[in-house]
Regions:
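Active-site regions of enzymes building and remodeling cell-envelope glycoconjugates
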Residues: 1-3, 90-99, 183-188
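Phosphate/diphosphate ligand-binding glycine-rich loop within oxidoreductases
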Residues: 1-34
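Active-site capping/gating segments
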Residues: 6-11, 165-175, 193-199
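Glycine-rich NAD(P)-binding loop of Rossmann-like domains
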Residues: 33-67
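Gly/Ala-rich phosphate-binding loop of Rossmann-like dinucleotide-binding domains
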Residues: 69, 73, 156
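NAD(P)-binding Rossmann-fold cofactor-contacting core
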Residues: 74-91
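Rossmann-like adenosine-cofactor binding region
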Residues: 86-179
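Adenosine-phosphate binding glycine-rich loop
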Residues: 174-175, 182-204, 208-209
Length: 211
């Protein structure tokens, strides 16, 4: 039985839109205002970061990562990426191999869109998080195995101005007892960043089957 990997251009668009939405959430301080609303507290003005001054690091620059990079470049963000193999992508500075620490330290926002492999398992651990900027944010839309969740929880508790936008977890659905639900600097979505649209997926598989 042949195995077909679905490359859905519309999924790429959905993933990119989700990423942009969470970047704007962080960039425009919406999470702070949301938490203030819950407390009935008028927090006052906060100056947002301009696009050109925000460096977004894409961890895993494959098919979907490229969609994110293209959208962010159009909007004048500074886009960098880390990937396993060397590559040239227009308007994206690529980091590889041992340069991962430089990639982490250069990013205001890190978007993890890594696949689940032995090499990516718990790649975002205590050391990784320690090298992220104090007021930065992490978006995970790849696979839950990429994050060592205990390390992330500890980092979030110790750094109130660090934000995490999490669409995937090691075990889903996320248990109601999980500490992630309780943290004010966490936004959780139920694995919806790249929902597969049935009709285009069926058409894609059929086109490959005919070949």
């Amino acid at each position: 039985i042949p195995i077909i990997r679905i490359k859905d251009e519309e999924m790429g668009e959905r993933i990119a839109n989700y990423s942009l939405a969470q970047i704007l959430n962080y960039q425009l301080n919406f999470k702070i205002f949301q938490n203030s609303q819950i407390k009935h507290y008028w927090s006052g003005e906060r100056t947002p970061i301009d696009n050109k001054n925000l460096t977004v690091g894409i961890l895993g620059l494959g098919f979907l990562g490229n969609h994110i990079a293209k959208l962010l470049n159009k909007l004048n963000y500074n886009v960098i990426a880390y990937k396993k193999n060397r590559a040239k992508v227009k308007n994206v500075k690529i980091y590889t191999g041992k340069n991962i620490i430089s990639f982490i330290k250069s990013s205001d926002v890190i978007i993890s869109i890594l696949p689940s492999t032995p090499q990516t398992n718990n790649i975002i651990d205590k050391k990784f998080l320690k090298n992220m900027k104090k007021n930065s944010c992490l978006i995970n839309i790849g696979r839950g195995n990429a994050i060592e969740e205990k390390d992330l929880l500890n980092h979030l508790k110790k750094n109130k101005n660090f934000y995490a936008y999490l669409d995937v977890f090691k075990n889903e659905p996320l248990k109601s007892s999980s500490q992630f639900w309780k943290l004010p600097n966490v936004t959780i979505t139920p694995h919806v960043a790249g929902v597969t649209a049935i009709e285009p997926s069926v058409k894609y598989m059929y086109s490959k089957y005919k070949k």
